[in-house]
Amino acid sequence: MKHVDIFTDGACSGNPGPGGWGAVLRYGDVEKELCGGEADTTNNRMELLAAISALSALKSPCEVDLYTDSAYVKDGISKWIFGWKKNGWKTADKKPVKNAELWQALEAARDRHKVTLHWVKGHAGHPENERADELARKGMEPFKKGKAVSF
């Protein structure tokens, strides 16, 4: 099974507002960069889309180390999702889970691979996380100008 390192980030100008996501995928010496965005979104949605898009870009099952600066993504997929599923995608206080469709997509993308999640401190000089942040801002830029783009 191939081993891939993935670094993801999301960005939003206003929350909600125009947003973008970015991901760096590394397999040995080969790197691939992905980014995209939406006109009206939240930072959490962009963080989720970064992870979903990166995992979905892998053509075959892989052993993945996924690095995110989002405790929301890390805790959601590794802790909270079990209760949400048991409760019919409701929170402990019976409210609908926010971004349920993205959590379901992330779970499906994750389940194709052997994924280990890692939390990294954002904006702390971690080179790949900084690059993912640059890609997220690049993905957001067209939406700040009213255009759509995905790379």
Curated annotation (Swiss-Prot):
Residue sites binding Mg(2+) 1 per the record: 9, 47, 69
Domain RNase H type-1 span(s) in chain numbering: 1-141
Catalytic activity: Endonucleolytic cleavage to 5'-phosphomonoester
Residues holding Mg(2+) 2: 9, 133
Keyword Methyltransferase: no
Enzyme Commission (EC) number: 3.1.26.4
Cofactor: Mg(2+)
PROSITE patterns assigned: RNASE_H_1 (PS50879)
CDD domains registered for this protein in UniProt: RNase_HI_prokaryote_like
Cofactor note: Binds 1 Mg(2+) ion per subunit. May bind a second metal ion at a regulatory site, or after substrate binding.
Functional description taken from the UniProt entry: Endonuclease that specifically degrades the RNA of RNA-DNA hybrids.
HAMAP family from the UniProt entry: RNase_H (MF_00042)
Protein name according to UniProt: Ribonuclease H
Species of the source: Rhizobium johnstonii (strain DSM 114642 / LMG 32736 / 3841) (Rhizobium leguminosarum bv. viciae)
Phylogenetic classification of the source organism: Bacteria, Pseudomonadati, Pseudomonadota, Alphaproteobacteria, Hyphomicrobiales
